Amino acid sequence: MATMDVAPQGTGGQLGRKRIVNDMSIQVATVNGSGSQSSNTVLLRAIFQMGVPVSGKNLFPSNIAGLPTWYTIRANKDGYIGRKKEIDFLVAMNAETAQDDVMSLDAGASVLYDEPLGLDKLRNDLVFYSVPYDKIVATVCPEAKLRKLVKNMVYVGVVAQLLEIEMGEVEKAIRKQFATKVKAANLNLAAAQAGFDHAKANLQKRGAFYIERMNKTAGKIIIDGNSAAALGCMFAGCTVVTWYPITPSSSLVETMIEYMKEYRIGPDGKATFAIVQAEDELAAIGMVIGAGWAGARSMTATAGPGISLMSEFAGLAYYAEIPGVIWDIQRVGPSTGLPTRTSQGDILATAFLSHGDTKHIMLIPCSVTECFTMASEAFNLAEQFQTLVFVMSDLDLGMNNWMSDPFEYPTTPIKRGKVLTKEDLEKLGGFARYKDLDGDGVGYRTLPGTEHPAAAYFTRGSGHNDKSSYSERPDDYENNMERLNRKFETTRSFVPRPEIMKGANAGSSNAGSSNVKIGIIAYGTSHWGIIESRDQLRNEYGIETDYLRLRAYPFTREVHDFIEQHDRVYVVEQNRDAQMLSLLKLDLKPELTTRLRSISHLDGLPLDARSVTDELSTMEGK
C-alpha cells in the first residue's frame, strides 16, 4: 500500500484548526446495491432542513450491484449548488476504492472510514476518524441479514455528530424517508443514534468543517429533474406516453405512471390516459406520432441511443408535420458509452435528426423548475407548429436531487394551434392542409373524426403538394421545403428567450457595464458551474464577464446581439466537439464566428466551476 508522509499514530496531527462553516463537499464512497441511497438522502435532507442550501449528485455504475458508487453532497451558504471538484469530507465505506479516494483528497480534508480499512497510515495531512461499523450495527440490529443495509445509517449519525448536524433533523429526515414503514424507520433511527453516540464518546473533533443552522431553505423543496418533468407533462395535458426503458430517462416515465394513476383517473374509475411500453425506441416514437396525428398530446422519454433509433420517424413527423414531445435525458456516448454519466452530447444530432433537410425545436432546461415549466411550453410549441419538440435534459439534472422553490400552478392555457373545426370548414368550404395562408409557414390541420366532408386529407412522408396530394414535381417539393424553413424561422419568436446576466450584478438581466468585453454562453446544467465561475473569475483574476444562458434552439435575436456586443465569447458545454458552438456558427454572420471560443468538459462528471475558471483565465492570459 502506497503511503504519503505517514502520520504519527494516524491522528492527522493538528489539522483543521480553521473553522469552515456551511461550505463543504461531502462524498460517500460505497458499493452499489448496499442500501446507501436512503442514508445519503437522509444526510442531504437533514442539512437542508437546517436551512443550508444543498445539492446531491450520485455517481453510480451501470450494473445492478457490486461496483463502486460515490454520492456527493454539497452544502454552501452562498447558494452555489453546482458540483465542487474538491472533496472536503470523505466517508470511505468501500475497500476497493478507499485508497484511491484518500490519495485524491486535498490537504486538510477529513476522512471517516470503516475501522478494518486502516486508512490512517496513508497520509499525515488529512484528518482521520476510524469507526467500527460492524460492532455498532450489531448492537441495534439483531437480524444479521439486515445489518448490511442498516450499517450505512450508522455513518449518518457519526457525520452528524462530527459536523454538528442536529440529530433532531436527522430523525425528521429518517421519518420522511421511511414514512410508510414505521419499523424500518425505528431501526434506521436507532442505527443513526448509535453512530452519533459512538462519535460523541470516542472521536475527538479535529476537522475544520461544521454545519450551522441558517435560513436559506425555508419553503423550498428537494426534487429530481425527471420527477419535475413528469409532473410538468401531466399538468401540460399529456394523455399518451410511449416509451422503452433506458437509463437515465426511465424514471421520468416511471414517475409519470404513478402521478397519472393518482391524479388522472376519471369519475368512472377509468384511466384518462394511455402509457405503453413499446418493444423499442422506434416503435415508441411511432406511437407518439400516431397519437399526435389523432389529436392527443403525446410524448416519449429516451436517451442518446434511443434518439439515434428514432431518426427515421423524426423525419416523418417533421415532413408530415405532426406534433409530439421527446425528452432526451442525455448521457455519455457514442454507442453504449457510459450509461450512468452525464453529457450534453446529443445537441447536433437532435437539431437535425433524420436524413435530408430537417430542423427541430429544442428546449434546454437548467433546473427542476424549468423541467416543470418547459413541459407545457414544449407541448404548446409542438401543436402550434405541428412538429416534434425535443426537451434536452441530462443525467445530472434528471436523476439527481436539486433544491428549488415550489412550482407554480400553471395558468397559461393549452395552445392547440391551427386546428379547424366543423364550423370552420363550413365557413371555408374546404382547406389545403399544407397551404401557407398566414405567411408564417404553418398550415391548418383537422383532427380525425371531424364531421365534415372536407376534413379528411392524406398524411404522407413522401412528396406532396399543399393539398397533401402525392407529387414529385420539383416546384411542389421546393415550395414545401421552403415553407417548412419559413415555419422554423417563425418559431424564433415563440421559443423561450435566453437569460442574460451582465456585469457584477449577476442577479439582474439589465445590470452591468457595456464595457465588458468577455461573454460566456452556456446551457442546461452547465449554468450552475458558470454562476460560480463568474464570481471566481471576478474575485481571483479581476475578469468581468457577461453571461447568456441559452434556453432554446432556434436562437433568438438576443443571442446574435450578445455576441456582437463582446470581443470574445466563450461557449461552455459538456461535449468534445463544441456542438452548440457549431450550431451558433451556422446561425451567425461569418464575421461574428471569429469571436467564439470553446471550453469543453467531457469526463462524464457534472461541470464544476473551477474547471471553467482555470481554462478561461488561462485563455485570457492570466
Outline where the language-model segments fall.
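A short helix->loop->beta-strand "cap" motif at the edges of active sites that frequently abuts
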Residues: 105-111, 125-126, 273, 322, ...
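Metallocofactor- and cofactor-centric catalytic cores in central/energy metabolism, strongly enriched
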Residues: 13-15, 53, 72, 76, ...
